[in-house]
């Protein structure tokens, strides 16, 4: 059974997001969000990393929700429900840690204006070109979680690309997909958030977060697959070196041809290449300052741990 929680202001709504898994985080839990991994989400939820601060893109997306909704209304002729513009959260008594806040709800043309006939609209602003037949997977997950927790039968994803192109797609609720997603989110919440287990690394960045330093002397035996990867990587690096050497050779020959000229042009005067010195700039001579004022510098010198380097032997 669903429950609706209303808030006094957006700040209160933002604070409430930390109490569960939001629809925008569903794709992350499933490993389908290109911007964040399950491990990084876990670190944020557990307070290891600071909470997300609304950046310009996030604020702009919120402010432009109404514009996207109006484009959707214009194209689809659906009725946007005004009350749905407020900040609120829908939860379900069965899974109270799954918390959704649909951007808008609407009634389709000809539908009876009652609760059972409502549909959900998710509004997106993006710089990416969107293919309506191949929508971003984390967008799809977000809408399905909104539909499932909110107990709606269908909805739509609408997007505005670079402020110039608008598109939308109607999407039905998929009970089978939602059931699988609910199970995965439940496992993530109970095992990692409530159970305090640390999730496995999902990317190389996760490994650096988990293990910024190596364990001296520790060795692991390569599997056949890893052995093949190492051989392939060495071959790729060798090809890269060959290309880099050829690139340098060509650049050196071009510079010999330039002499003291600024540009190389074709027979029609079109510029093909330039070789110019940058304008002179002022630079603080740290080494000279340290030599002249060693005591003052000593108070500001600190040890900085370098990142782990991958070397192929």
Residue ranges and their predicted role:
Residues 1-313:
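Accessory terminal regions of nucleic-acid processing enzymes
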């Amino acid at each position: 059974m669903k429950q609706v929680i209303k808030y006094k202001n957006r700040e209160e709504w933002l604070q409430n997001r930390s109490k569960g898994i939001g629809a925008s985080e569903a794709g992350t839990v499933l490993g389908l969000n290109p911007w964040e991994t399950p491990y990084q989400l876990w670190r944020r939820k557990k307070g290891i990393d600071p909470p997300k601060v609304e950046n310009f893109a996030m604020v702009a997306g919120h402010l432009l929700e109404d514009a996207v909704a109006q484009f959707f209304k214009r194209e689809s002729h659906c009725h946007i429900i005004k009350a749905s513009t407020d900040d609120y959260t829908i939860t379900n008594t069965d899974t109270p840690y799954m918390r959704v806040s649909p951007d808008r709800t609407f009634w389709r043309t000809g539908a009876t204006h009652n609760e059972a006939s409502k549909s959900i609209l998710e509004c997106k602003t993006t710089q990416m070109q969107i293919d309506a037949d191949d929508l971003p997977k984390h967008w799809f997950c977000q809408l399905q979680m909104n539909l499932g927790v909110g107990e709606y039968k269908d909805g739509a994803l609408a997007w505005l690309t670079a402020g110039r192109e608008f598109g939308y797609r109607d999407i039905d609720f998929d009970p089978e997909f939602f059931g699988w997603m609910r199970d995965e989110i439940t496992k993530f919440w109970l095992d990692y958030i409530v159970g305090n287990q640390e999730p496995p690394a999902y990317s190389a960045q996760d490994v650096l977060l988990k293990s910024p330093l190596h364990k001296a002397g520790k060795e692991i035996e390569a599997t056949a697959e890893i052995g093949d990867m190492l051989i392939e990587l060495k071959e790729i690096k060798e090809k890269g070196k060959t290309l880099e050497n050829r690139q340098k050779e060509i650049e050196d020959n071009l510079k010999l041809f330039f002499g003291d000229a600024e540009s190389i042009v074709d027979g029609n005067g079109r510029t093909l290449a330039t070789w110019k010195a940058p304008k002179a700039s002022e630079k603080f001579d740290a080494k000279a300052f340290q030599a002249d004022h060693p005591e003052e510098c000593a108070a500001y010198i600190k040890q900085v741990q370098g990142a782990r380097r991958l070397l192929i032997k």
